[in-house]
């Protein structure tokens, strides 16, 4: 078990110590009603994932937000392992930014972890007045005790990759993290590595471009991102822009968990590849493609070629395995990254997707598969959509997946998700030899929610996980 520490702060002293942490018993995830036809607020669902519990694989609590159409998306913590050395800090609030509403909800999960309650609403008007930004995305806690939230837009819905700073105790908006006028042209995700005085951020598109759906013409017009921005962590300014070759729509970005590491990976959604970024011999930063998922030639789809669409990536806490989801093709892959320059495919599992046998799409040419995969049926339910958000247990032995990307894109690419709701699945991981296997006893069907089918998104464990915690 992890070392007990009576005078320590939240989280764990090291990533390897975190791997010894307790098994997850509950999971928090936002559920979205925007674009579904149900006039109800988004809510935070609490799911029981303890196999010994009589409520295993069930939603045990729902916390509705006070407004409609927020489009809750990602979440983070008031504090995490970056504050491990501060015994005055406690991980007890979940930060929930609204991608469309630009509000931030602070949820108390410390008083009663199995029944969270709303602690504070930070109105969009306050954020707009102090920061001149909109469309909030990734939230990370900082060693300073502050919370930082990335943005995608300005007040007119144009691109603006800024970072909102919140006080980690009062949750007052303090302003923006970056120097005045030094926001990136577009934003999305970010990760920092203070030992090397660096932060990296990615770009999706301006809110005006992505909010109502995906238009291929916008790609041709250069309206989607293809860059990584490298920031000076102490000076709060961009010091390098990495223009990726064949790196369209870089979304989730992760440094290795080892705080001394000078490399990491980014998943490029549309070009369906994984690129490695690293500090080079000259002391600046470079990027190279290390994994490519080939597109499939198809008939009966919106385009003649279908990309995998890599929408989420994770690194195990020991930095041994990289996982990613191909939302359109329908598979999750596990790569051994013992040699980060040459990842090796170690496991793969299909969990639905757009190319299943008997569906509307016919695959004409496939560089990887000899036949179209069978539809996935769990507990008698055919799974709509494809795997999207993924979360790994601390010990690396269980992977959880949900199937919703973003309500407007769900409606466009997987209309079944709107009618039937999204699903939450669990995959068992072989951490010795590699390999992924579905747990047939686990399914959370968000199509059966009390107010109608909902779109469940990113997953969080109460004690932190491999995409929320950063070690310094």
Swiss-Prot record:
Biological or metabolic pathway of the protein: Organosulfur degradation
Family note: Belongs to the selenium-binding protein family.
Gene disruption: observed consequences: SELENBP1 knockout results in accumulation of dimethylsulfoxide in the plasma. Methanethiol oxidase activity measured in tissues from knockout mice is significantly lower that in normal tissues.
UniProt KW keywords: Acetylation, Cytoplasm, Membrane, Nucleus, Oxidoreductase, Phosphoprotein, Protein transport, Selenium, Transport
Cellular component GO terms held in the UniProt record: cytosol; membrane; nucleus
Name of the protein described by the UniProt record: Methanethiol oxidase
Matching Pfam families: SBP56 (PF05694)
Record-listed N-acetylalanine modification sites: 2
Tissues of expression: Highly expressed in liver, kidney and, to a lesser extent, lung.
Record function comment: Catalyzes the oxidation of methanethiol, an organosulfur compound known to be produced in substantial amounts by gut bacteria. Selenium-binding protein which may be involved in the sensing of reactive xenobiotics in the cytoplasm. May be involved in intra-Golgi protein transport.
């Amino acid at each position: 078990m992890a070392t007990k520490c009576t005078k320590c702060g939240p989280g764990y002293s090291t990533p390897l110590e975190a791997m010894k942490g307790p098994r997850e018993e509950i999971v928090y995830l936002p559920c979205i009603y925007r674009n579904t036809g149900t006039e109800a607020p988004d809510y935070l669902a609490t799911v029981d994932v303890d196999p010994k519990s009589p409520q295993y694989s069930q939603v045990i609590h729902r916390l509705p937000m006070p407004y409609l159409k927020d489009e809750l998306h990602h979440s983070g913590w008031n504090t995490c392992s970056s504050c491990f050395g501060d015994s005055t800090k406690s991980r007890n609030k979940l930060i929930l930014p609204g991608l469309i509403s630009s509000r931030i909800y602070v949820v108390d999960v410390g008083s009663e972890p199995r029944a969270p309650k709303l602690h504070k609403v930070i109105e969009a008007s306050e954020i707009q007045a102090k920061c001149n930004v909109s469309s909030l995305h990734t939230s990370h806690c900082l060693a300073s005790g502050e919370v930082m939230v990335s943005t995608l837009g300005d007040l007119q819905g144009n691109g603006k990759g800024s970072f909102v700073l919140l006080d980690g105790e009062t949750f007052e908006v303090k302003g923006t993290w970056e120097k005045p006028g030094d926001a990136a042209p577009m934003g999305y995700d970010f990760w920092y590595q203070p030992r090397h005085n660096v932060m990296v951020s990615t770009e999706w598109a301006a809110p005006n471009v992505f909010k109502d759906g995906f238009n291929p013409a916008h790609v041709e017009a250069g309206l989607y991102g293809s860059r990584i921005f490298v920031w000076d962590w102490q000076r709060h300014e961009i010091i390098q822009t990495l223009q990726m070759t064949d790196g369209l729509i870089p979304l989730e970005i992760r440094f290795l968990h080892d705080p001394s590491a000078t490399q990491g990976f980014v998943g490029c959604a549309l070009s369906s590849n994984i690129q490695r970024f690293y500090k080079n011999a000259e002391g600046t930063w470079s990027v190279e493609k290390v994994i490519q998922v080939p597109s499939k030639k198809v008939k009966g789809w919106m385009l003649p070629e279908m990309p995998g669409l890599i929408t989420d990536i994770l690194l195990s806490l020991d930095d041994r395995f990289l996982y990613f989801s191909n939302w359109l093709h329908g598979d999750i892959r596990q790569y051994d990254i013992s040699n980060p320059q040459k990842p090796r495919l170690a496991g793969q599992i299909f969990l639905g997707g757009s190319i299943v046998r008997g569906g509307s799409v016919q695959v004409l040419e496939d560089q990887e598969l000899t036949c179209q995969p069978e539809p996935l049926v769990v507990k008698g339910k055919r799974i709509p959509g494809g795997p999207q958000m993924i979360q790994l247990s601390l010990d690396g032995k269980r992977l959880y997946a949900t199937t919703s990307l973003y309500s407007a894109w769900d409606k466009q690419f997987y209309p079944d998700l709107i009618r039937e709701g999204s699903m939450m699945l669990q995959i068992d991981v072989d951490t010795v030899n590699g390999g992924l296997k579905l747990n047939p006893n686990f399914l959370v069907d968000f199509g059966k929610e009390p107010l109608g089918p909902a779109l469940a998104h990113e997953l969080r464990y109460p004690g932190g996980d491999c995409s929320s915690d950063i070690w310094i």
